[in-house]
Amino acid sequence: LSLHDALPICRPTDLPALSRFGDEGIDLFLCDSTNAATPGVSGSEADIAPTLKRLVRDAKQRVIIASFASNVSRVQSAVDAAVAAGRKVAFNGRSMIRNMEIAERMGYLNAPRGTFVTMDEASKMAPHKVVLVTTGTQGEPMAALSRMARREHRQITVRDGDTIIFSSSLIPGNEEAVYGVINMLSQIGANVITNQDVKVHASGHGYAGELLFLYNAARPRNAMPRSD
């Protein structure tokens, strides 16, 4: 649970309400602990958006942004970057397409009319006119980005000079798969950008400083830390 109030689509965490519940007495507090060992506070989505805009603006050919399909705020930042650069956006990967259709229908994902195109349409467009937002951040063998890296994707062929942005974190245990995909993309000649190169990801899991703030507000009798 990140406490930042600068997310593109979310309401800020209602800390006064949590404090009121603490006054009344909380028997059990279940709280995210994924980044509990990381000191300080997590980065904000507002810090990521300008970087994505710059990377998309400076790219000469196709841009492919890999993100978690559940991270609608990040996808909105990617869409905003594409719009600012005069590019269309296509979603790639079953979960990404489904989630963004729902997000758009509910008003959580917004773009000027005509921004979104299908993958079939994107495959026929000039590379510098489109941004693909895709699944596959963890090197899943059947995910869209992995199939692109193996040159097995039905609609898109990654070419020398394309820009691939991993706007995600590396989940422990997936290193071999992710680096394998990165290596294949690099061998093609793509410009691969990860969070180790430039700040293109902010965790949605609060750091130790944010968790301390929450626990001080809630003051529970019992706590059950959990990790997603």
Spans of model-derived segments:
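C-terminal regulatory/interaction regions
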Residues: 80, 84, 103-109, 114-228
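His/Asp/Glu-rich metal-coordinating catalytic cores
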Residues: 1-124, 143-154, 176-179
